[in-house]
Amino acid sequence: MKNRVISLLMASLLLVLSVIVAPFYKAEAATVVNTPFVAVFSNFDSSQWEKADWANGSVFNCVWKPSQVTFSNGKMILTLDREYGGSYPYKSGEYRSKSFFGYGYYEVRMKAAKNVGIVSSFFTYTGPSDNNPWDEIDIEFLGKDTTKAQFNWYKNEVGGNEYLHNLGFDASQDFHTYGFEWRPDYIDFYVDGKKVYRGTRNIPVTPGKIMMNLWPGKGVDEWLGRYDGRTPLQAEYEYVKYYPNGVPQDNPTPTPTIAPSTPTNPNLPLKGDVNGDGHVNSSDYSLFKRYLLRVIDRFPVGDQSVADVNRDGRIDSTDLTMLKRYLIRAIPSL
């Protein structure tokens, strides 16, 4: 957040975090992940993630509701909408990991919400609710101008490290990758595989949870602009990655969109394109899952062999796994 806003609201925010959020979390031994972690948001994985069901108060003019975190077509969707009969005028979604993550490279593929007065985010956080100091690293999109991303971080409650990066595109129009590499003496921020900013002062040290949320501001019009009450608004997320050893091969996911494989023979059907639209993307992944669950008995393409992505003569879960690895860029082609 803006330093000028934090200076005015720090005390109330800390009080709300400790009084309101803490009761919803029981103190447990922290599980810190130290191996590569990839989450593709095709469905709700309650073993790894949780949907918030409380209110932060202070500058957050909404209550978090599990109903506002949904999954469709290979995406996790956070929806900001009206809340009737409650203590807050709006409800929205927050999704957070159950485990903690420390130094390493973090990446998300997402599409931000666009509207004055709101924030779409990807960040790590720990604080009083986890019996830890407040340490946080943020990538935020202010809905009033989604051609920019705001980077920030906190160490032991001290922020004021905001940097506003001009993206060169509108983050609300398409999916792009955003990431940061967190090390003891610096944080490097990435956009579509390119390092765009390095921070070196007051670097946080405490492992935190991976979080995403969408919220309307209250009392921070100078920062976000005055929210006009427009609903519904959505931020969408395709995946999250974490690599403790840093940026994979010194090059995070470089491509802002999922490009289809190009067959050697252009007359051959495109492997993995099970819906026949000429592209291989999350819609094919969702359709493939329905086939394996026997919700459908065939794919809507003439040549069913497009689903045999590993070319072993069978269509099974091995093909789905390979398709998933392609979509998260773990393999370059099918």
From Swiss-Prot:
Catalytically driven reaction(s): Hydrolysis of (1->4)-beta-D-glucosidic linkages in beta-D-glucans containing (1->3)- and (1->4)-bonds
GO annotation, biological process: polysaccharide catabolic process
Catalytic residues in the record: 136 (nucleophile), 140 (proton donor)
InterPro entries recorded: Beta-glucanase/XTH, Beta_glucanase, ConA-like_dom_sf, Dockerin_1_rpt, Dockerin_dom, Dockerin_dom_sf, EF_Hand_1_Ca_BS, GH16
Every Dockerin domain range: 267-334
Pfam families xref list: Dockerin_1 (PF00404), Glyco_hydro_16 (PF00722)
Keywords from the UniProt entry: Glycosidase, Hydrolase, Signal
Keyword Signal: yes
Domain of life the protein comes from: Bacteria
EC number(s) stated in the UniProt entry for this protein: 3.2.1.73
Residues in the signal sequence: 1-27
CDD domains: Dockerin_I, GH16_lichenase
UniProt keyword annotation of Iron present: no
Family note: Belongs to the glycosyl hydrolase 16 family.
PANTHER family: XYLOGLUCAN ENDOTRANSGLUCOSYLASE/HYDROLASE PROTEIN 8-RELATED
Protein name: Beta-glucanase
Species of provenance: Acetivibrio thermocellus
